[in-house]
Amino acid sequence: SEAFISEIEKDFHYIVAVQNDVIIGLVTWLPHGLPKHGLFELDRICILSKTRGKGIGRGLIDKLIKDADRWYKSMGESIRKLYLFTHEDNVDAHIFYEKVGFDHETTLKDHYYKYQNERVYSKFFN
């Protein structure tokens, strides 16, 4: 679709989790700014509902970080900050992100939609 092609053109990176030839999870990320900034965004993560709670999300986050680290190192730089946005009322996501090492950095009021606040979660690297 056009949205997928647009994402590829913007340098989105895709990582999938596969079990018995079935995709059970997906995470996407993209770099922001110049490579020297080491800034990248977790754009999307989704796990097949019947496979949740089995470490797949954590594994995808780990692979995302390794992939981004490799990508930045290929340019002579290193990762500094991974961030994401999530709806303020998505409590399950907040619990997950905090469990895998993200910190709630701030909340953006009416960020995408009126009356829908977004939380910004970040993970910093040395």
Residue ranges and their predicted role:
Residues T106, K123-N126:
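Acyl-donor-binding surface of acyltransferase catalytic domains
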Residues S1-K50, I61-K63, D67-W71, F124:
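Acetyl-CoA-dependent GNAT
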Residues G25, T106-K109:
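A structural microfeature
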Residues R52, M75-A93, D110-Q116, F124:
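Conserved beta-strand-loop-alpha-helix junction that forms the acyl-donor binding cleft
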Residues Y97-T107:
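Conserved acetyl-CoA-binding loop of GNAT-fold acetyltransferases
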Residues F12, Q116-V120:
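Short hydrophobic/aromatic beta-strand or adjacent loop that forms the aromatic wall/cage
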